[in-house]
Regions:
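N-terminal loops that bind phosphate or other acidic moieties
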Residues: 1-133, 137-377
Length: 377
């Protein structure tokens, strides 16, 4: 019997690897002769780098970079087990969590540090980049990142502007002659789960600006600046970024990646599952386990359990999801490939208790599911 275990993390409690091991521990009490394959995964958001490192036996690389407001921050990215692929989360270097709430202002934040992470990966000979968007503090159109990679953004006097949201107001021309030539030989995959355009009422500034500290006046200013940036980008690169779906992701970082790098945007879960080769693992399996901290009506929208179930169902396999809790209309997952959902909280308990005991409770739940599976049918 071959069992594949491919869960996401239980946020604020267990990493995806810890969840995988807990489920394996419980199942092995009953299925003692089974072959277990653990594949910790993520949906392209928080925890993706660590999950891919764990799944491929890769390594962390720590780098001191410039944070969103210019201070030094210690960030990391992952080099996967193949030694050729780097996984970078934008939030590591340019995340909103790096900016104190009283200093949050997307006119003043820059994605420069994300560019420094990419540069470090190139210096290590990386040929394939996976870049996760989301959680950014920026609305600079990715100009900070591009500046770190050699692009010059100039005002009407030919002087460099500050590559942040506010600096874009002064943008008059773009010089790409210094863009790092090594990027042309790289494969760049961007984990992106939003389809917002760069500008307009559904654009980066209007939709994501307020949560980063933008006032209504700021939104208008930033949107206008991104529009001019988009026009110049199209002139310089010949690529249509103003109306491209996903260009507005992460404060316009999507536009920078699509315009200046050989990038392709894909749903995060698809990139992750392809990278960990989940299909190869489940092709000859008998049952698949997945899960996440909370399963509810949102789970069907590109979350890990749905991605895992989709792959498993291509091979006609049963899929069991284990969760910390369920929410409204969690039954929606039953229409999308998951056959049963089980919750690991064994009694009434506080949230701190549930988080602290999650590993033990999850293992016990997995054991009970295996025992149930053993019953004559």
């Amino acid at each position: 019997m071959k069992v594949v275990i491919a869960p996401d993390s239980f946020k604020e409690s267990l990493t995806a690897k810890q969840v995988s091991e807990a489920i394996k521990s419980g199942l092995s009490r009953v299925w003692q002769d089974a072959e277990f394959v653990t594949v910790p995964v993520a949906d392209g958001g928080e925890g993706t780098v660590q999950s891919l490192i764990d799944a491929t036996e890769g390594e962390q690389v720590f780098v001191t970079v410039k944070g969103p407001i210019g201070n030094d921050v210690e960030a990391f990215y992952g080099i996967l087990g193949d030694g050729e692929t780097a996984v970078i989360e934008m939030a590591e270097a340019s995340g909103l969590h790096l900016v104190p709430s009283e200093q949050r202002d997307p006119k003043n934040t820059s994605s420069f540090g994300t560019g420094q992470l990419i540069l470090n990966a190139l210096d290590r000979g990386i040929q394939r980049l996976i870049i996760g968007l989301g959680g950014s503090a920026t609305n600079d159109g990715g100009t900070g990142m591009l500046a770190a990679l050699g692009v010059k953004f100039l005002d009407s006097d030919g002087q460099p502007i500050t590559p942040n949201g506010g600096g874009l107001v002064e943008l008059a021309s773009i010089d790409v002659s210094g863009l790092d030539a090594r990027l042309a030989g790289c494969e760049v995959l961007v984990a992106c789960d939003v389809d917002n355009p760069l500008c307009g009422e559904k654009g980066a500034s209007a939709i994501f600006g307020p949560q980063k500290g933008a006032t209504p006046a700021d939104v208008e200013l930033l949107d206008s600046a991104l529009s001019k940036y988009g026009e110049l980008t199209e002139q310089v690169t010949g690529k249509h970024v103003l109306t491209q779906k996903g260009a507005g992701a992460a404060g316009g970082m999507g536009a920078a990646l699509l315009g200046y790098l050989p990038a392709r945007l894909k749903p995060g879960i698809e990139i992750v599952l392809e990278t960990v080769k989940l299909a190869e693992h489940v092709a000859d399996a008998d049952i698949v386990f997945t899960g996440e901290g909370r399963i509810d009506h949102q789970t069907v929208h590109g979350k890990t359990p749905m991605g895992v179930a989709k792959v498993a169902k291509e091979y006609g396999l049963p899929v069991i999801a284990l969760a910390g809790c369920t929410g409204d209309n969690f039954q929606a997952v039953y229409e999308c490939g998951i056959d049963a959902v089980f919750v690991c909280v064994p009694r009434a308990m506080s949230l701190p208790e549930a988080l602290e005991e999650a590993e033990v409770n999850l293992a016990n739940l997995a054991e009970n599911v295996a025992r149930l599976w053993q019953l004559p049918r």
